[in-house]
Structure formats: structure tokens, C-alpha cells
């Protein structure tokens, strides 16, 4: 039986859709259908000419079809049919009271905008559908594509002005989505610096929930991802609709439950302080808004998104074909906690010796190597090697690192400048500012206006020179403040708000050009931790820095939240010193290692002070990690026990795609009343296959079989040794199919 998504269209028995192709159009009913990955998405043109959503959910049958869309009726005289009808891309006009997709002001002051279907073209994996205002020559081309494996849709819009006068776009969503009336739980991610990735779950009440960043970048406080589950939250069961916006500037997602209990979701550029002037013939391209559906709970949704990101979002470097997943990340050492700004040739070489002894793959020198960079008060913008610290340049250090069989990475912060720098003294007009107004500093730095062509050329130029002159494999690209005074006085006053779009476009353009010129160089997106993580930056960045907070217990909850939206492949997780600088919490090296081994592993501790036992422990666990890393970062992730809500325990499991290997991590936060770790029933294994159990760290209960069927491990489960108790304890096991 079809779900109520199709309540405004009658079901027909005659099929006009050929399901061998991902996209089909019924010209008689004016209905579009997209199929992929056990998902169907259907929309059509109603008799008024509006583009109306009809269905989004599990895949429909090959003989199922829809009649022409029927608009929703009005509700008394206060809510017209126009506002009640779930439009694919509604203009703000004709009495629309829900969130519009597009809002504009014309040269004569008119602000009414009603978009009707004009035409469409089929593409390889979807449609381009053209809408036009009922009178004015403003066009919105909606781009639809569906992934045949996951059923995840990619939607965006191109706004074009064919009027004889300029039009100001005041709001432009990438897409609008709709769900029928029902009881739902909204899931989204919130946080702050050093406290990112908090999974927030709440009933979807009447009204609007706005999730946004006004900061000029993605932000720590919210992330452009959502998941809406029918009914109560459930990891393994129930329908989930989810989405992620690919934009690294100011953004907004609005989730509304309207007066008739229907749900609308819009997302795109943040309309706060937004105004993009389109001159005749000009276009505005929105970001891409990805949306997906799972019938298998939040776990099923996140696994779909993980594999979609690996297959279609992350960069393809040399040696990795489009059909192959990106390679697992190198295990890195980063110098920051060991030396902070006090870097020099001899000290970094000594750290490189220690890192190589651990089995590290990549040595990364952090802040302090350039200009007059003794602390965070000076030097940003002057990207030349400090001759006092590195009298022979970077080459001797890089050669040393290569001789130790590691590659070399370097920290940069290209979009920032210190007022105490040669660059700022020469070009004070290059920063975001309003002339004559104070310039607000954060961390003693200002933001370069990357929207300016001269700033874009400078940033690309110095990075290209740095990478051309040095054998650098990796850049840790940082961004340590948000915007203030977002002026751009090169443009007329009415057009200066274009800075919100052009800054981010130029960031992407620089990254794309660097990839073209230096295709082997990999990038990490860092912004004081997780302040710039989204599917836009991940088109160019191979990994991200989730948080400056590396406390291993805090990271369990952060990594849990992160995993709902992003693959563990990109989640860098460092082992740092104990007690931790933020919480003063003391934990064992084993606990810290296992916490970080759930993602892409890094060492950020001051290893110059490690004793032989610590070196041996880290070396052993790094070697064990290398053996199972592809399963951990590219497999199916199952969150077996959540670390949230005061849980004493937590556990995760990953299973590789052919179900030949699985890795399990178990953590005790704080044992209470002598309770033992609960029996852990595993998931995702082949029930008919036999799996051997091998300890990476810790012991199973005496009598646990050395090998058993997948059915045993999933139905009976794994019991831990009676002595697995205490505070901040960790264990890990691998299972290998015989």
C-alpha cells in the first residue's frame, strides 16, 4: 500500500515509467519520477502550473503511476491553497506564509514572485526543470539527480534574470522538501568551540526550527545536516528522511511543521544580511542540497550517507579512480602540542625520528614556521619561511622526513592576516571592513576578503609557490575566526552583500586550481576544530579536524554525533597528552589510542617526553590499526551503545562491505555499583559465515569461542572479561571470516 505521500494524486494502474532508467516523465499526467537505491521521488505540475511534490520514500512498483498533481485545498480564508500545497520551489508571492525558496525585489519595487513550470530537459541521472514567474522574466532552473546505489538526491537551482533591469535576490534556497502530516522527531547537530557535534533530538512541534550559521563559514554552533524520523528516535528501525547542504559560507536550513501538520524543509544561502543583485543576463547558482531516505532508522541513514560521501563527494587523488573509494588516511603526527609556535629545524627533526619509530605515515609541522610568527600576534599573511628557525628553508626537514619513510605536511591559514604583518601594512584594504569603522580582531587577526580578485590571486599565488618549491604532500588548512564587518567597498553599496557568495566561491576556486596544479597534495579542513565541515568543503578536502578538544572521553560523544552526518574516513582523531589541557582529566594511553582509532588516527602528543613503555604501546596499536583501518573508516558503522545521556558504557562496530571483517570498540566511562559491561550483540555479519575473534586490546569472558558463526555473534553476542571494570577503560576486537 502506498504511503500518504500520494494523498494529493490518484494512483493509476498503467505505468509510464521504465524503472531501468533513473528518471522518467509522464507527459500526459505531467509527472516526474526518479528512482534509485530502493527510493522513489515523484513530483508533478498541477493544473495551476506549480511544481508540486507527490512522493518521497521507499521505491514504488514498476506498474505504479500518478495522475496529475492536485493542489491542496484552502483552509478557510486564512490559508490559501498556494501556501498549503507542497511546492518544489515556491516563490514568495500570492499569499505564501511558509518559508519560500526564492524571494526577490524587482527594479520597480515589486516583490511578488509566483513560479510556474515552463519546460524541462532530461539529464543522464535526472532532470533540469525550468520555472518562470507568471509575468516577469525571472527564471529558476531546478537541477535534480539521483544516485542509483543510495537513492540520495542532489538538488540545486540556477536563478537567471532576463528582465531589462537588475533584480535583487533576497533569498535563494537550493531546494525545498516536503513530508506529509505525521509525528516526527527532528535530529540535528549543535555545539560550540571545543564542544561540537552534539546530537540534538526533539519532537517536531508546530512552527519553524531554524538551523543556521550567520558567521561567514559553516560554524561550530550548528552543522548543515538534518534527519527527520517518523515517530520516536530509533537507530535500527523506522523511516528517516535526511539532508546535508554543501556550502561552507553562511547557510540556513528551516524545518517547518505548518498549520495543517505537514512538514517543509528548505535550505540554502542564509537570507540574513543577504542580497545578490542580478543584472540582465546574469545567473546565481545555489549550493547543492542532498537528500536521502532510509527505512532502517538513523543507523541506516548514516550508512547510506557515509558510502555516498566516499563514492561521490570526497576528492579523487592520483591513483584513485572515480569508481574506487578514496584511500584510507595516513596515520599522522602533528607538532602543535609538542612545540606550539616554537618550531625549528633541529626540534622538528628530533620529533620526526620519534614519530617514525611509532610507525607514523605522515609528519605535519604546525603553526610557527613562517614570517615573524613567535605567537598569535604577528606573521599571518607573510608566508615565507622564517630564516632564524629554518636557515636553509624547509628542504632539510622535508628530506629528513622522507628519509624516515614518511611524507611531509604543513599548517597554513591562508584566509587570515595579522595587523602586525607586512601584508597588512601594504594592503590594509584587503580585509573585510566597512571604511571608517573599527575592525574587530579575534585571536589578533582579521579576515582577508577572498571575494576580491586581487586577494584570490595572492592566496593562490603563495600557495602555488610554496607547493612548487617544496615537496609537500599535505596542507592543514586552518581558519581561526568568524566574520565581522562584512564590507566589500570595491562594489557599489547595493551589491556589497555579494561577499557572502563570492568569498566561498573563490575559496572553492582556489582549492580546485590547487588540485589541478598539484593533484597529489591532500588537504585538511580545520577551523579551530569543526568550524568548517560540510559537503561543500569535502569536495576539496580529504579530511577534517572535528574539534580542538582531543579529550578522549569528550571525543566519544563528539565522534558519535559526527558519525550521523560524515564518514569516519574524514574524521581525524588525535591521541594527545594526559592530563588533558581542557578538562584536566587523566586517562591511560591505551584508552586514548582506542578512542582515536575509531576514526582516522593521528598522534598529537609531545612524544619527545614519552617513555619506552608509551612508545611501545603506541607502536603496537598503530600496527594493529593499520591492519584493520579500511574496515574502520570505510565499512558499515553500527552504534551499538550510545555514549549519550549519562551512559556508563559505549560501543561501536564496523563491518567491511563484503562482511569478511569486523572491528568492535568497547568503552567504560565510569563503573557504577559493580555493573559489568553488558553482553554485546553484534550486527551486520554474515549469519552463515564463521568468524574468528582476535583481541586488539582487552579480554573476552573465559569460555568465549575462538570462532563462531555470524549468527552466534549477532544473537548470543560477546561477553567481556569480569575484570573489565573501572573508570575510562577500553577494549577492541577484530572478527575475521574464515
Q: What residue ranges belong to the model's regions?
A:
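Active-site neighborhood of glycoside hydrolase catalytic domains
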Residues: 391-393, 425-427, 431-590, 600, ...
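Carbohydrate-binding surface patches
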Residues: 38, 226, 643-687
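Polysaccharide-binding surfaces and accessory modules of carbohydrate-active proteins
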Residues: 22-34, 41, 51-256, 272-274, ...
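Short Pro-Gly-centered flexible turn/kink motifs
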Residues: 104, 112-117, 276-295, 728-735
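Conserved, mostly hydrophobic/aromatic
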Residues: 38, 157, 281, 363, ...
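Aromatic-lined carbohydrate-binding/catalytic grooves of carbohydrate-active enzymes
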Residues: 324-461, 474
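C-terminal beta-sandwich/jelly-roll accessory domains of carbohydrate-active enzymes
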Residues: 670-738
Amino acid at each position: 500500500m502506498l504511503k500518504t505521500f500520494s494523498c494529493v494524486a490518484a494512483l493509476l494502474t498503467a505505468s509510464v515509467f521504465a524503472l531501468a532508467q533513473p528518471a522518467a516523465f509522464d507527459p500526459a499526467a505531467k509527472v516526474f519520477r526518479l528512482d534509485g537505491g530502493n527510493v522513489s521521488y515523484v513530483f508533478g505540475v498541477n493544473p495551476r502550473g506549480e511544481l508540486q511534490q507527490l512522493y518521497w520514500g521507499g521505491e514504488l512498483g514498476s506498474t505504479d503511476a500518478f495522475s496529475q498533481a492536485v493542489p491542496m485545498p484552502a483552509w478557510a480564508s486564512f490559508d490559501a491553497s498556494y501556501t498549503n500545497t507542497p511546492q518544489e520551489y515556491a516563490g514568495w508571492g500570492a499569499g505564501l506564509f511558509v518559508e519560500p525558496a526564492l524571494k526577490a525585489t524587482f527594479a520597480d519595487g515589486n516583490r511578488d514572485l509566483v513560479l510556474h513550470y515552463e519546460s524541462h530537459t532530461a539529464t543522464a541521472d535526472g532532470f533540469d526543470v525550468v520555472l518562470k514567474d507568471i509575468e516577469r522574466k525571472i527564471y529558476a532552473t531546478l537541477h535534480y539527480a539521483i544516485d542509483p546505489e543510495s537513492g540520495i538526491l542532489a538538488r540545486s537551482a540556477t536563478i537567471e534574470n532576463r528582465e531589462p533591469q537588475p533584480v535583487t535576490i533576497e533569498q535563494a534556497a537550493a531546494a525545498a522538501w516536503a513530508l506529509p502530516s505525521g509525528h516526527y522527531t527532528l535530529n540535528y547537530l549543535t555545539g560550540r568551540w571545543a564542544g561540537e557535534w552534539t546530537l540534538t533530538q526533539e519532537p517536531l512541534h508546530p512552527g519553524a526550527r531554524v538551523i543556521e550559521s550567520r558567521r561567514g563559514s559553516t560554524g561550530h554552533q550548528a552543522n548543515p545536516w538534518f534527519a527527520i524520523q517518523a515517530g520516536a528516535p530509533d537507530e535500527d528501525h523506522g523511516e528517516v528522511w535526511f539532508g546535508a547542504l554543501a556550502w561552507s559560507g553562511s547557510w540556513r536550513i528551516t524545518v517547518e511543521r505548518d498549520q495543517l501538520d505537514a512538514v517543509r524543509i528548505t535550505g540554502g544561502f542564509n537570507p540574513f544580511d543577504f542580497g545578490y543583485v542580478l543584472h540582465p543576463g546574469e545567473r546565481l547558482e545555489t549550493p547543492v542540497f542532498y537528500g536521502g531516505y532510509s527505512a532502517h532508522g538513523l543507523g541506516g541513514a548514516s550508512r547510506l550517507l557515509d558510502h555516498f560521501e566516499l563514492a561521490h563527494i570526497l576528492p579523487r587523488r592520483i591513483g584513485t579512480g572515480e569508481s574506487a573509494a578514496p584511500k584510507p588516511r595516513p596515520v599522522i603526527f602533528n607538532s602543535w602540542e609538542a612545540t606550539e609556535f616554537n618550531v625549528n629545524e633541529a626540534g622538528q627533526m628530533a620529533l620526526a625520528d620519534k614519530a617514525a619509530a611509532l610507525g607514523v605515515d605522515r609528519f605535519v609541522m604546525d603553526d610557527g614556521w613562517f614570517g615573524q610568527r613567535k605567537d598569535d600576534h604577528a606573521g599571518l599573511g607573510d608566508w615565507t619561511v622564517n630564516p632564524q628557525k629554518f636557515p636553509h628553508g624547509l628542504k632539510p626537514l622535508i628530506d629528513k622526513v622522507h628519509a624516515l619513510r614518511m611524507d611531509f605536511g604543513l599548517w597554513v591559514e591562508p584566509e587570515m592576516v595579522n595587523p602586525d604583518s607586512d601584508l597588512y601594512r601594504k594592503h590594509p584594504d584587503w580585509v573585510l571592513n566597512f571604511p571608517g569603522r573599527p575592525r574587530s580582531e579575534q585571536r589578533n587577526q582579521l579576515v582577508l576578503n577572498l571575494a576580491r580578485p586581487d586577494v584570490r590571486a595572492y592566496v593562490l599565488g603563495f600557495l602555488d609557490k610554496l607547493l612548487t618549491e617544496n615537496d609537500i604532500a599535505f596542507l592543514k588548512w586552518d581558519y581561526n575566526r568568524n566574520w565581522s564587518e562584512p564590507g566589500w567597498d570595491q562594489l557599489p553599496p547595493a551589491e556589497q552583500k555579494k561577499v557572502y557568495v563570492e568569498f566561498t566561491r573563490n575559496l572553492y576556486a582556489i582549492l580546485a586550481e590547487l588540485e589541478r596544479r598539484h593533484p597529489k597534495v591532500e588537504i585538511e579542513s580545520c577551523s579551530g576544530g569543526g568550524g568548517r565541515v560540510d559537503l561543500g568543503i569535502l569536495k576539496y578536502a580529504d579530511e577534517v579536524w572535528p574539534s580542538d578538544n582531543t579529550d578522549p572521553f569528550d571525543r566519544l560523544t563528539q565522534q558519535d554525533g559526527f558519525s550521523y552526518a560524515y564518514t569516519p574516513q574524514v574524521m581525524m582523531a588525535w591521541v594527545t597528552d594526559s592530563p588533558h589541557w581542557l578538562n584536566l582529566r587523566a586517562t591511560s594511553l591505551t584508552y586514548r589510542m582506542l578512542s582515536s582509532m575509531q576514526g582516522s588516527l593521528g598522534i598529537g602528543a609531545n612524544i619527545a617526553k614519552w617513555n619506552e613503555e608509551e612508545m611501545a604501546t603506541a607502536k603496537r596499536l598503530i600496527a594493529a590499526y593499520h591492519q584493520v583501518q579500511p574496515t574502520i573508516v570505510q565499512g558499515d558503522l553500527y552504534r551499538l551503545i550510545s555514549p549519550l545521556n549519562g551512559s556508563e558504557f559505549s560501543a561501536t562496530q564496523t563491518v567491511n562491505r563484503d562482511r569478511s571483517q569486523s572491528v568492535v570498540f568497547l568503552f567504560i566511562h565510569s563503573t557504577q555499583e559493580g555493573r559489568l559491561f553488558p553482553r554485546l550483540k553484534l550486527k551486520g555479519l554474515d549469519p552463515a559465515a564463521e568468524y574468528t575473534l582476535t583481541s586488539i586490546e582487552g579480554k573476552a569472558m573465559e569460555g568465549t569461542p575462538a570462532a563462531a558463526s555470524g549468527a552466534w555473534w549477532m544473537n548470543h553476542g560477546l561477553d567481556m572479561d569480569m575484570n573489565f571494570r573501572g573508570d575510562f577503560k577500553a577494549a577492541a576486537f577484530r572478527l575475521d571470516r574464515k
